[in-house]
Amino acid sequence: MNDTIDVFILAGGQSKRFKGDKTLFIFDNKPMIEHVFETLYSFSKNIYIVSKNPEKYLFIKNAKSIKDILDIQNPLSGLYTACFYTEKPFLLVGADMPFIKKDLVEYMIRNHKKEATIFKINGFFEPLLAVYDPSVKDKIKQSIENQRASFQKLILNLDVNVLTEEQARSVDKDLISFSNINTKEDVKRFYNIGH
């Protein structure tokens, strides 16, 4: 277990396309969010689940369920909240990413430097599977206040250690770690790739 990093799982999405709460969708005998938690528990004993309704995730033992500080529907709110709960670098992941490979997480943590360490896949940053330093808090607040509340815009204002797609494929050849679930069909499709 690694105590040099904390983990924050963002569970604040609305699951509109999923038609139900995807974080609680059961496959392989457990809710999706529990798959994410179990993958990441080997990296830190400090795992937080950030959501608008923290009581919903109290069933996950060893996780700390916390409420989003800001009352806005935006993933930057979860990142902002994370900055208040830790003083060390932290891994941020989406609750709808149940196929994360441990080797990829390990690679990211080992290569973390600057304000953020983020993979760039197919020309786009992957901010919901990345390592951040809590010092980014003020820049997040500025982005939200200036109505530039998107991860892609925020990243342009951060000092980022960019990891390449080639580096990602060296530890996750199918890039399954970056698959986020939006429909029940996604679960089946990505499950078949990951197993």
UniProtKB/Swiss-Prot annotation:
It is found in: Cytoplasm. It catalyses: Mo-molybdopterin + GTP + H(+) = Mo-molybdopterin guanine dinucleotide + diphosphate. GO terms for biological process: Mo-molybdopterin cofactor biosynthetic process. Its EC number is 2.7.7.77. Pfam families: NTP_transf_3. One of its GO terms (molecular function) is molybdenum cofactor guanylyltransferase activity. Mg(2+) binds at residue 96. Belongs to the MobA family. PANTHER family: MOLYBDENUM COFACTOR GUANYLYLTRANSFERASE. This is Probable molybdenum cofactor guanylyltransferase. It comes from Hydrogenobaculum sp. (strain Y04AAS1).
